[in-house]
């Protein structure tokens, strides 16, 4: 498991108050992990802070699963490295 994946899963677990084992890549924040809209906003803010990146609102709306969060952060880091 990559460092980004581990960090994202840890943040999700802490923010949503769920066990680390429940935070699997295909899990939906709302349907599988019990998040509400405020939880998802706070989660996006925590990811932005941890990874020192900005997630535009239109992108944040698309991040509905653990894998989507991992993919966004990974892609964001790749772009930052190439700049």
Swiss-Prot record:
Gene3D superfamilies: ACP-like. Keywords: Cytoplasm, Fatty acid biosynthesis, Fatty acid metabolism, Lipid biosynthesis, Lipid metabolism, Phosphopantetheine, Phosphoprotein. Pathway: Lipid metabolism; fatty acid biosynthesis. 4'-phosphopantetheine is transferred from CoA to a specific serine of apo-ACP by AcpS. This modification is essential for activity because fatty acids are bound in thioester linkage to the sulfhydryl of the prosthetic group. The keyword Cytoplasm applies. Pfam families: PP-binding. PANTHER family: ACYL CARRIER PROTEIN, CARRIER DOMAIN-CONTAINING PROTEIN. This is Acyl carrier protein. It comes from Blochmanniella pennsylvanica (strain BPEN). The lineage of its organism: Bacteria, Pseudomonadati, Pseudomonadota, Gammaproteobacteria, Enterobacterales. The gene is acpP.
